[in-house]
Amino acid sequence: MEWSEVEVHTTNEAVEPVANVLTEFGAAGVSIEDVADFLREREDKFGEIYALRREDYPEDGVIIKAYFLKTTEFVEQIPEIEQTLKNLSTFDIPLGKFQFVVNDVDDEEWATAWKKYYHPVQITDRITIVPSWESYTPSANEIIIELDPGMAFGTGTHPTTQLCIRALSNYLQPGDEVIDVGTGSGVLSIASAKLGAKSILATDLDEIATRAAEENITLNKTEHIITVKQNNLLQDINKTNVDIVVANILAEVILLFPEDVYKALKPGGVFIASGIIEDKAKVVEEALKNAGLIIEKMEQQGDWVAIISKRGVE
């Protein structure tokens, strides 16, 4: 089989949206490369850094590589893929010195390249995300989330995902009922389950995402707690008295359903909203207030913001 590699040079802030677009167009695997990844890859057990050629790694920003079967359909889609990526800037996602290149690669290269740069990531002092193929020995009481990030959704390395997991660690109580809107890889649902949630509904409009979530949920043996549903936000979800709703999606999407979140939450229930670029935080904050939610806290990592709000106790 012949394969094509799509290489996109962009910013750290754009990593997850770009990776999601590439996956939606049918990428079989995605790798993310930055300076820190290359340095870590070449560090041996004694801490020595091997010499790197300047051309071996990006000078700034990030290089995202996605691998596609080289079919007639894919070749015809190339201009559409490039334009869809460029259109992300209309959502105020900074693309930086955007570059889009397509190369041919062999079978072996595409099958392993994307795995090389994904390593265990410690999110909190209790929670670590580990790629499914790596051997990792947890410390006492450490919570391990195994992920296969081949589908490119929410690997845990993106600031928005980390902000959500930290908020879940702070607010989720054992026995809580959770709704995860826009679940992607299922990482937030899995984190909720391992933190002690009683039941979790994970929704996503994208069929590829729901399949990826189901696979990761099974990998983590949490399928008895988590139900995955292909669904548009909270539309036709008739749950009420939910303890926590969590959504790691773009600000423009969060603005579509704060009233539905309010209806779903029990009095005192918590809404964790991330995926919000700093410039959009005020708009989202006002929308949540207008829906009747009370702003509890705002957390920031880089240019990304998470807003934690609550339904008032009536």
UniProtKB/Swiss-Prot annotation:
<feature type="binding site">
    <location>
        <position position="161"/>
    </location>
    <ligand>
        <name>S-adenosyl-L-methionine</name>
    </ligand>
</feature>
<keyword id="KW-0489">Methyltransferase</keyword>
<dbReference type="GO" id="GO:0008276">
    <property type="term" value="F:protein methyltransferase activity"/>
</dbReference>
<dbReference type="InterPro" id="IPR004498">
    <property type="entry name" value="Ribosomal_PrmA_MeTrfase"/>
</dbReference>
<keyword id="KW-0949">S-adenosyl-L-methionine</keyword>
<dbReference type="InterPro" id="IPR050078">
    <property type="entry name" value="Ribosomal_L11_MeTrfase_PrmA"/>
</dbReference>
<protein>
    <recommendedName>
        <fullName>Ribosomal protein L11 methyltransferase</fullName>
        <ecNumber>2.1.1.-</ecNumber>
    </recommendedName>
</protein>
<comment type="similarity">
    <text>Belongs to the methyltransferase superfamily. PrmA family.</text>
</comment>
<dbReference type="GO" id="GO:0032259">
    <property type="term" value="P:methylation"/>
</dbReference>
<dbReference type="Pfam" id="PF06325">
    <property type="entry name" value="PrmA"/>
</dbReference>
<dbReference type="InterPro" id="IPR029063">
    <property type="entry name" value="SAM-dependent_MTases_sf"/>
</dbReference>
<dbReference type="GO" id="GO:0005737">
    <property type="term" value="C:cytoplasm"/>
</dbReference>
<comment type="function">
    <text>Methylates ribosomal protein L11.</text>
</comment>
<keyword id="KW-0963">Cytoplasm</keyword>
<feature type="binding site">
    <location>
        <position position="204"/>
    </location>
    <ligand>
        <name>S-adenosyl-L-methionine</name>
    </ligand>
</feature>
<feature type="binding site">
    <location>
        <position position="248"/>
    </location>
    <ligand>
        <name>S-adenosyl-L-methionine</name>
    </ligand>
</feature>
<keyword id="KW-0808">Transferase</keyword>
<feature type="binding site">
    <location>
        <position position="182"/>
    </location>
    <ligand>
        <name>S-adenosyl-L-methionine</name>
    </ligand>
</feature>
<dbReference type="GO" id="GO:0016279">
    <property type="term" value="F:protein-lysine N-methyltransferase activity"/>
</dbReference>
